[in-house]
Amino acid sequence: MKKKLLKSSFFYFIYKLLKILRNKKPSYHYGEFAEDVFIDRILKNIKKGVYVDVGCYHPFKGSLTLRLFKRNWSGINIDISKTSIDLFKISRNKDINLNLAVTDYDGETFYFQNSPINQQNSLIQSNEEQRKIKIKCSTLDTILEENRIENFDYLNVDVEGAELNVIKGINFKKY
């Protein structure tokens, strides 16, 4: 009965899909739902790629770029949390690590902080207990130009509801 239930479940489908994609038993993943495993499989033929991680949060926990970093990729990690970026500066010191907000304009904005390192820190206020903090903001175009990034192979955007403003700030025809 248990085996029958497992085979008919959504989890069994995911298990089989992972097994097919990796052609082996599932290994450790860093992303919350093993997205990094899929990303790594898709990009496996690119040896020294470049990633841009907007809303990077943590260099290990939940990271969708750590596997790429371990394969000698490099990139830009951007987060509104100074504490998060300080962790990246220690663990990924060859990457470009920026403490700023990515928006559809250059200047300053405010973000709302739950705690110094928290996945829910956001440009969008979700509760009245959050601290309001002023921060520099730039478009992705400006950031890439200032850091002389001419192209990138992987873009990860996880900014708690402000993704559209990030996308508005990049010229995809250029990159």
Located regions from the model:
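Phosphate/nucleotide-binding beta-alpha loop and adjacent structural elements of enzyme active sites
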Residues: 1-175
